[in-house]
Amino acid sequence: MPDPKNPVPGSIPVDLMRPEDTTTRLAVSAFNGTADQALGHVRDYAVVVARQMIGTTEEGGNNRGPAIESMLVDAGGKPGMPWCLAFVQRCYQRGFAMCATASVLPQGLHVGHFAQRCLRALPSACSNRPTVGAIALHYPDGYDAPGHCGIVTGIHGAISLSTIEGNTNEAGGRDSTTGDGVWPKIRPLGYWTLFVDIGFLNAPGVA
């Protein structure tokens, strides 16, 4: 289990890192790992970033506020749109930046369409088996219906998962009008439709 302050052995502690810090990027890129190891470290950093963002909340209306709108714009959206996937994209984009690794994730803010793109472009990363750091996707009514997502932070047997999710409330709802934010959740395993773990891309023996 990675140390939450320093998930990559021998690297700079995450609380000292910033994506725009060139020195940090060079230090991380000096880590001599294989492609799948590098992507695994991106995933681990995404979990750290997600934990740091717990407590981020909407301000001034549903799906509004400086932090929320920044995530939406960075993910190609507009203020006022649902932002659970924008939160996941933010965590992973910071992970890619920290590891000086190009993003492999599809863009977009619609959960079902994102799942479709992952299944087409990243089939070896997609599974119905959860792993810590994986992107958890919920779209039980099909690819075109509204969905939800989060980042897996813990697995409790075959019963439930711990996640960190954006655009959720303390009752566990999604995209409500009651002041959503970034919160840790525990949900039944069956709630989730698909898991995407980029650490499995290019792993030995995986096409």
Give a label for each model feature:
Residues 2-98, 202-207:
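N-terminal capping segments
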Residues 2-18, 25-35, 142, 146-207:
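Aromatic- and glycine-rich peptidoglycan recognition patches
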Residues 62-66, 104, 177-180:
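Generic preference for flexible, low-structure residues
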